[in-house]
């Protein structure tokens, strides 16, 4: 354990929208498949989020949450459109708030990444263009103008539903090859109308979704997640990638959202190193506006290092979002501040559908339990 409290940048308070965080260690959104067949979070999901609200002033971002039945792409993922779903989320939010923490709901539409077997009731596999994820994969249908407008409205209604359920805000999932990203990136978007064909047009869908969500719930309740370099689901391969995301991020800055979340998935190209593992080019575009969350395999040491480096370069608005380590370490902020090693995670149980295994059975540190008088 640390001998003295650290003054590290990672441990300094940060205002995110309406939320006054006591440190800069965020729980990143992680899909876990612990919802029933109707997209209602299972009863024990409340305990999962409650465990990770272990240090007051922590921001948690939920797993990806479907905005409508048509947006569904996988079984056992939660939704936010029905009253039973919202009631389950109200209980989860109440549990998090009782621990003096904050929680944003991540809003999701899968597009062409959906499992075709899940698309029941005459739902089509849809995307920006009729371009499959893989060359011989299922062929999606390009959305029409009316459908695009309806999807934008659906994101706005989902945001209202989330705020009605008590969430402190929402995060728009514009990353990792899902529907919004399918409009942003030229590797998928082959349109030649006002939704494609140029950097500005490809960014339009993300911008209009964000604008509609802001109009619905307020800019200080809206975060946006992007993943410029992610190669997941056929993304991250376009030319003009940096200019595309520089433009989009500049537009998000003008919209004055509560935060920008930039995620780096595991780099898949073994032939060359990652061009920008800490998204420094995009941090510069974002500047000193609202907070910027960086995610991408950080541990305690690398999180402290990058926040110090960013602060030294005048970017004092940087926070770190932990995914896998927050799964395995419910008391993660406490451990990092105390200098206690983070717990190893079991990747095999990340997606153990409907199971408590690998979900509720990661222990708190002995030091945390002693401090909070847990029974031994």
From Swiss-Prot:
Gene this protein is translated from = easA
What Pfam families does this protein's entry cite? Oxidored_FMN (PF00724)
Q: Which Gene3D superfamilies match?
A: Aldolase class I
**Looking at its record, which EC class is this enzyme?**
oxidoreductase
Record has Oxidoreductase as a keyword? yes
Name the residues annotated as catalytic in the UniProt entry: 178 (proton donor)
Q: Which residues form a coiled coil?
A: none
User: What induces this protein's gene, according to its Swiss-Prot or TrEMBL record?
Assistant: The expression of the ergot alkaloid synthesis cluster which leads to the synthesis of fumigaclavines is positively regulated by the brlA and stuA transcription factors.
Record has Oxidoreductase as a keyword: yes
Q: Which SUPFAM superfamilies match?
A: FMN-linked oxidoreductases (SSF51395)
Domain of life of the organism in this record? Eukaryota
Name of the molecule in the record: Chanoclavine-I aldehyde reductase easA
Residues reported to bind FMN: 29-31, 64, 106, 173, 225, 297, 323-324
The family this protein is said to belong to: Belongs to the NADH:flavin oxidoreductase/NADH oxidase family.
Which cofactor is recorded for it?
FMN
Entry keywords, A to Z: Alkaloid metabolism, Flavoprotein, FMN, NADP, Oxidoreductase
**Reaction catalyzed:** dihydrochanoclavine-I aldehyde + NADP(+) = chanoclavine-I aldehyde + NADPH + H(+)
GO MF annotations for this entry?
A: FMN binding; NADPH dehydrogenase activity; oxidoreductase activity, acting on the CH-NH group of donors, NAD or NADP as acceptor
Q: Kindly state a single biological-process term from the GO annotations of this entry.
A: fumigaclavine C biosynthetic process
- What's the stated role of this polypeptide? Aldehyde reductase; part of the gene cluster that mediates the biosynthesis of fumiclavanine C, a fungal ergot alkaloid. DmaW catalyzes the first step of ergot alkaloid biosynthesis by condensing dimethylallyl diphosphate (DMAP) and tryptophan to form 4-dimethylallyl-L-tryptophan. The second step is catalyzed by the methyltransferase easF that methylates 4-dimethylallyl-L-tryptophan in the presence of S-adenosyl-L-methionine, resulting in the formation of 4-dimethylallyl-L-abrine.
Name the pathway: Alkaloid biosynthesis; ergot alkaloid biosynthesis
EC number(s) per entry: 1.3.1.100
Q: Which residues bind substrate per the record?
A: 173, 176, 351
Q: How is it used?
A: Ergot alkaloids are known for their toxic effects on humans who consume contaminated grains or livestock that graze on grasses harboring ergot alkaloid-producing fungi. Due to their strong affinity for monoamine neurotransmitter receptors they may also have clinical uses such as treatment of migraines, Parkinson's disease and cerebrovascular insufficiency.
Listed InterPro entries: Aldolase_TIM, OxRdtase_FMN_N, Oye-like
């Amino acid at each position: 354990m640390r001998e003295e409290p650290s003054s590290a940048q990672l441990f300094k308070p940060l205002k995110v929208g309406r939320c006054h965080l006591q440190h800069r260690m965020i729980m990143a959104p992680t899909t876990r498949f612990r919802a029933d067949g109707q997209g209602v979070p299972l009863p024990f999901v409340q305990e999962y989020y409650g465990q990770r609200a272990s240090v007051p002033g922590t921001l948690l971002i939920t797993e990806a949450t479907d905005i409508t039945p048509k947006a569904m792409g996988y079984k056992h993922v939660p939704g936010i459109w029905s009253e039973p779903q919202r009631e389950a989320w109200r209980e989860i939010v109440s549990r998090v708030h009782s621990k003096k923490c904050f929680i944003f709901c991540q809003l999701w539409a899968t597009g062409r990444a959906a499992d075709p077997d899940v698309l029941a009731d005459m739902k089509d596999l849809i995307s920006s263009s009729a371009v499959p994820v893989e060359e011989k994969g299922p062929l999606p249908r390009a959305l029409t103008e009316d459908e695009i407008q309806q999807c934008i409205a659906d994101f706005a209604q989902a945001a209202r539903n989330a705020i009605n359920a008590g969430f402190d805000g929402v995060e728009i999932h514009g990353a990792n090859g899902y529907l919004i990203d399918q409009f942003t990136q030229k590797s998928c978007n082959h349109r030649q109308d006002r939704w494609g064909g140029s950097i500005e047009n490809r960014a339009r869908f993300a911008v209009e979704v964000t604008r509609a969500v802001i109009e619905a719930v307020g800019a200080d309740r809206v975060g946006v997640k992007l993943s410029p370099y992610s190669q997941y689901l056929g993304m991250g391969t376009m030319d003009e990638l940096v200019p595309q995301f520089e433009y989009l991020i500049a537009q998000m800055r003008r919209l004055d959202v509560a935060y920008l979340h930039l995620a780096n998935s595991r780099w898949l190209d073994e032939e060359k190193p990652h061009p920008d593992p800490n998204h420094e080019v995009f941090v510069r575009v974002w500047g000193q506006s609202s907070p910027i969350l960086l995610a991408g395999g950080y541990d305690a040491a690398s999180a402290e290092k990058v926040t110090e480096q960013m602060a030294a370069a005048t970017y004092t608005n940087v926070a770190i979002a932990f995914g896998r380590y927050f799964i395995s370490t419910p008391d993660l902020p406490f451990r990092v501040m105390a200098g206690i090693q983070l717990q190893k995670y079991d990747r095999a149980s990340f997606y153990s559908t409907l199971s408590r295994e690998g979900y509720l059975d990661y222990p708190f540190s002995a030091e945390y339990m002693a401090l909070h008088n847990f029974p031994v």
